[in-house]
Amino acid sequence: MIFAANLKCNHTRASFKIYAEILNKTMGAKCDDIIVFPPSVAFLENENNFMQGAQNFYPCVNGAFTGELGKEHLDEFGIKCVLIGHSERRALGDEELIKVKFNFAKEHGYKIIFCIGENLDTKNSGKTLEFLKKQLEIIDLNYEKLIIAYEPIYSIGTGVSAQTADIAKVLEFLASLTKVPLLYGGSVNENNIKEILSVNHCGGVLIGSAALKVENFIKLIKG
């Protein structure tokens, strides 16, 4: 199972160092199925027992791109995993860059967690599967380092996860399109994680607020 934590705009370099130390000690040995996405200012240079990922990046090595992170910066911290397509990035106008980002990350051999998800209007209109398929049309579903995370927008940060039957329907559909690992994200917590992980084709979870405290993240990993 893959356990990924998106810390979003939380944690400082100092607090994430403590987070990492506790997680490293608890894990004991390296495991690339445990992935943590800290804010870029909190990236750690030292080796960790988990995989450190980037929440965002710009598809360049370096250059005149004010305020952006290029491959050169990710390389300095040994970053080999990137998050692409999160709804909070799409809402900020990232949509047009998604295909370019994916192709750049693929070209340079990054592990990619590619996020897809529909809003409540799309769900209620019965067009979820059609919408998700369209989101996936711009990427290579056969890329060997691809992971797809289904995160319904109406569940992100709301405390209300999607219904298990809905998750199962979507993951079944996605499994018919690709053989890559499939994750669920959207208000994953200690009360629902076991049920979510029991869904057919679910290969793990992408966790947000429930992973902000390392002790909580460890509980979720241990089940």
From Swiss-Prot:
It is an enzyme of class 5 (isomerase). One of its GO terms (cellular component) is cytosol. It is found in: Cytoplasm. It catalyses: D-glyceraldehyde 3-phosphate = dihydroxyacetone phosphate. The keyword Isomerase applies. GO terms for molecular function: triose-phosphate isomerase activity. PROSITE patterns: TIM_1 (PS00171), TIM_2 (PS51440). Keywords: Cytoplasm, Gluconeogenesis, Glycolysis, Isomerase. Involved in the gluconeogenesis. Catalyzes stereospecifically the conversion of dihydroxyacetone phosphate (DHAP) to D-glyceraldehyde-3-phosphate (G3P). Belongs to the triosephosphate isomerase family. Homodimer. NCBIfam families: PRK00042.3-2 (NF000728). This is Triosephosphate isomerase.
